[in-house]
């Protein structure tokens, strides 16, 4: 299992529209990549204002999703909800309850 996390660092003067992110952007990403859903975090206190975690069954599935033509549309949608440059992490899930 591969987890793809996108984190948005708290940045002075930056904007982030949580409603648009939850209602439009993340569903667009899920539909594009053929996923049933994702976990969305809204930062309360700490270094990130928001994060999302997508799960893929394998590294190959993740790589195929990133290479899909619709991924460009997902990336192009970012300015519609934030001025923050996100940080990403790709991780292998080694344990899950």
Task: Locate each region found by the language model.
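Macromolecular interaction modules
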Residues: 1-97
């Amino acid at each position: 299992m591969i987890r793809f996390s996108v984190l948005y660092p708290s940045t002075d003067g930056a904007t982030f529209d949580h409603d648009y992110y939850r209602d439009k952007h993340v569903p667009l990403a899920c539909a594009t990549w053929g996923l049933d859903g994702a976990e969305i975090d809204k930062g309360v206190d700490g270094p990130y204002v928001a994060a999302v975690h997508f799960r893929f069954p394998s590294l190959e599935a993740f790589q195929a999703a990133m290479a899909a033509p619709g991924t460009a549309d997902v990336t192009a949608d970012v300015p519609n909800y934030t001025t923050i440059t996100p940080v990403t992490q790709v991780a292998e899930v080694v344990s899950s309850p």
